[in-house]
């Protein structure tokens, strides 16, 4: 059989009657059963073609699959229509800056009204010299052992803002009971102005509900 016929036979392009018998003869294998054709790699193993799944040269198989397709090289080299096109250069390479939604509450700055409004002049009058609350002090005890300091300030006639926010509930409750008893014994007043914040007022200091509200709104932390 000529080389051309062998090539045609290998690719299955030659008619069955043109095949020579040596393509079907195997030394250790009998002829294929009637109606059954051996796989191509088995039929042509004797002609120098290795069977599928061989382990002899794995690098050859890697070379077949690792080579990038031709079109990738074209795109990398600036092929028209790719991402290197001038149409996409600025859009793809420059980071896009997304539009930011303006703050929803920006227009409300400086426009607080009502009970939460700060009146600097009113607060100055509330704590100005000669006012009953002019010498007010804020104490932030860490535990019950500081009850003595609260009692001494109150006994000297100083209004005391008692901030118990940093205390645990058990000690805070003990200190509230102490302050309430102290105010009762010295004929003063004991009022709540915020959560875990109380105002102890001596007997000669009359603090109205409006003044207590202003103290809470102005931020009692500013008055030491």
From Swiss-Prot:
Organism from which the protein derives: Mycolicibacterium gilvum (strain PYR-GCK)
Self-association and partners: Homodimer. Interacts with FtsZ.
Cystine residue pairs: none
Keywords: Cell cycle, Cell division, Cytoplasm, Septation
Any one Pfam family match given in the protein's UniProt record, by short name: SepF
Family: Belongs to the SepF family.
Domain of life where this protein originates: Bacteria
Gene name of this polypeptide: sepF
Function: Cell division protein that is part of the divisome complex and is recruited early to the Z-ring. Probably stimulates Z-ring formation, perhaps through the cross-linking of FtsZ protofilaments. Its function overlaps with FtsA.
Entries under InterPro entries matching the protein: Cell_div_SepF, Cell_div_SepF/SepF-rel, SepF-like_sf
Stretches the record annotates as Disordered: 21-78
Localization: Cytoplasm
Protein name, as recorded: Cell division protein SepF
Record field: compositional bias (Basic and acidic residues): 54-66
Lineage: Bacteria, Bacillati, Actinomycetota, Actinomycetes, Mycobacteriales
A GO biological process held by the record: division septum assembly
